[in-house]
Swiss-Prot record:
Task of the protein: Could be a S-adenosyl-L-methionine-dependent methyltransferase.
InterPro entries: Methyltransf_25, SAM-dependent_MTases_sf, Uncharacterised_MeTfrase_YrrT
Biological processes per GO annotation: methylation
Family to which this protein belongs: Belongs to the methyltransferase superfamily. YrrT family.
UniProt: S-adenosyl-L-methionine binding residues: 53, 74
Name of the protein described by the UniProt record: Uncharacterized methyltransferase Exig_2346
EC category name: transferase
Length: 212
């Protein structure tokens, strides 16, 4: 996973902040309610918190506004450089969902990142986080996902019809999950999980680790 989409991260690093603010019409709906999504993830997090795919630090800054103990994990050198320039005092680790070092955490969070993992890798990542989380610890993230395969294919067809070929290629290339698959991944690992939709693409997932 660490190198699978590294070229995408490298290409997007310099323009990511413009994209999330709606300047790219292809991704305008993907990032609708972006500020609200970030604020909600940050509010639901519990310190100490580990953020995966910290990128250019948009969620990271909100986490720091609310929590004392924040670790950012980011695989892209270009993204890490921007992040460190923005927040020089932040602990930043070169890593990703399947390769990181965290001795303790009460929550793991991410936004627009979990889809880089295959469904099998998503399960592996949840296993790794579950080993560290205490009872009542949480995994909180926002990402594109679909209620069914039919919904995913329909969204791709609509993107192509609008001439949003970059978005369509993105939806076909990466591993955007189905909600029933994610429900099974979390439930089978002892998490109580909820899904809340924020726009056509993005859902917020809050998974709490239950007792034995």
């Amino acid at each position: 996973m660490t190198v699978r989409f590294m070229d995408v991260f490298t290409e997007w690093a310099s323009t990511y902040d413009d994209t999330v603010t709606g300047h790219d019409p292809e991704y305008k709906e993907v990032f609708r309610r972006y500020e609200e999504i970030l604020d909600t993830v940050a509010t639901k997090a519990i310190s100490p918190v580990v953020e995966f795919g910290a990128g250019t630090g948009n969620l990271t800054q909100r986490l720091l506004d609310r929590h004392q103990d924040v670790l950012a994990v980011e695989p892209s050198p270009e993204m890490r450089e921007i992040l460190i320039d923005k927040i020089p005092t932040l602990p930043v680790q070169d890593g990703h969902f399947l390769s990181f070092t965290a001795d303790h955490a009460k929550s793991f969070v991410s936004t627009y990142a979990f889809h880089h993992l295959t469904d099998e890798e998503k399960g592996e990542a949840v296993d790794l986080m579950a080993q560290i989380l205490p009872q009542d610890g949480k995994i909180v993230y926002a990402d594109t996902m679909f209620v069914s395969e039919e919904a995913r294919l329909q969204t791709i067809a609509e993107a192509k019809a609008q001439g949003f070929n970059g978005l369509a290629e993105d939806l076909e290339r990466e591993f955007y999950p189905l909600i029933p698959v994610m429900e099974q991944i979390f439930a089978s690992r002892g998490f109580d999980v909820t899904f809340t939709q924020y726009n056509h693409f993005v859902w917020l997932v809050e998974a709490e680790k239950m007792g034995e």
